[in-house]
A protein has these predicted regions:
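Positively charged n-region of N-terminal signal peptides that target proteins for export
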Residues: 1-4
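N-terminal signal peptide c-region/cleavage motif recognized by signal peptidases
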Residues: 13-15
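Ligand-binding "clamshell"
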Residues: 19, 85-96, 148, 163-166, ...
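Short, glycine-/small- and polar/acidic-enriched structural segments
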Residues: 20-154, 158-163, 167-174, 199
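Sec/Tat-exported extracytoplasmic proteins
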Residues: 40-43, 48-49, 71, 76-79, ...
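Periplasmic-binding protein-like
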Residues: 99-108, 185-212, 223, 261, ...
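Secondary-structure end/capping motifs
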Residues: 213-298
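Conserved C-terminal helix/tail region of periplasmic/extracytoplasmic solute-binding proteins
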Residues: 285-324
Length: 324
């Protein structure tokens, strides 16, 4: 009885003093957010004194606006462009970790059409979203000579792609390729934009400068717990996180989540590059500087922008969670 009482008392401080945190995703619950759901389901956030609510996003949800309005404490920024936008627009928020070392964005084509390299797609119609047009599309224009005349609207619906063997569209590594295989029973050509040399980070965690300044301990605990959740999800049993994902997003199947998780692992989306030595979430000032220089030269951002204001290295590169 005494031993049980001692164990309960040991847990009480975390339960009583847990800080409430609201965290927004940039899309619906799926394996690409598995680490966060794993951290909730397995008590990793609770162990760090945090009571975290994960709010999924979607096509009609602008969590960046909710973050700026103070209705979210932390938010997933899809890519490095959003972080630089904060600087350009003088908005006092910044990136505190980059969970994805590689952007999982892909271009997808049908096999047997000669559309199996980025270079081969020059001059051909490609379905992309408005966000992509102002994002990594500019990298492809500079790298491979693509033009805006190639752009066709992408509505996040696979029907146009499936009905046209010459069609090419954007997608995400762990999602659309699987759906195409399941629906059309064909193996599509999948080209990862990061493999073509795109150096932008992806799935970045953003918060306010005010929070960083006034509550750095919470930021540190949130980032460390999120990183631990990712190591647990990738290297351990993902079932707890997957169960929460399915509860949040009933469209998710076990097969799709397994495919998404395996895609993250196979391509080193989280743990390659600097993350291999410094841990998941790693960022490097040199990489940020190089990315800014490239998008500045493409005319996306003005010269003289202080890219160091887009991020802080205060909470990463500390090998948190490695070996767990």
């Amino acid at each position: 009885m005494r031993r049980l009482l001692a164990a309960v008392l040991t847990l009480l401080p975390c339960a009583v003093h847990a800080e409430t945190v609201t965290f927004g995703l940039d899309w619906k619950a799926e394996a690409e957010y598995g680490g966060y759901y794993q951290a909730v389901a397995t008590g990793i956030y609770a162990k760090h004194g945090l009571d975290v609510t994960v709010k999924q996003g979607g096509p009609q949800v602008n969590h960046t606006q909710l973050l700026l309005a103070g209705r979210l404490d932390y938010n997933i920024s899809s890519n490095s462009f959003l972080a630089l936008n904060f600087v350009k627009e003088n908005i006092p928020f910044r990136t505190v970790a980059s969970m994805f070392q590689k952007d999982p964005s892909v271009l997808i084509a049908h096999a047997g059409q000669g559309n199996d390299t980025f270079a081969a797609l020059k001059g051909k119609p490609i379905m992309i979203s408005s966000d992509t047009r102002v994002g990594w599309w500019n990298f492809l224009k500079a790298r491979f000579g693509y033009t805006d005349a190639q752009i066709r609207p992408y509505t996040f619906n696979l029907a146009p792609f499936l009905s046209d063997k010459t069609a090419i569209q954007q997608g995400f590594l762990g999602s659309e390729p699987f759906s195409i295989k399941e629906t059309a029973h064909e193996e599509p050509v999948v080209m990862l934009v990061a493999d073509a040399g795109f150096t932008g980070y992806a799935s970045l965690i953003a918060t306010s400068d005010k929070r960083i300044r006034e509550n750095p301990d919470q930021v540190k605990r949130f980032i460390e717990a999120s990183i631990e959740g990712w190591y647990s999800y990738l290297n351990g049993d993902p079932a707890p996180g997957n169960a929460l994902i399915k509860k949040e997003n009933p469209e998710m199947t076990d097969a799709l989540m397994a495919y998404g998780r395996e895609s993250l692992k196979k391509h080193g989306i989280l743990d390659s590059g600097d993350a291999a030595k410094d841990g998941i979430g790693a960022m490097a000032a040199a990489r940020w500087a190089a990315f800014y220089a490239s998008v500045r030269d493409q005319g996306i951002y003005p010269a003289g922008l202080d890219a160091t204001k887009a991020y802080t290295l205060q909470f990463v590169n500390q090998k948190a969670g490695m070996g767990k």
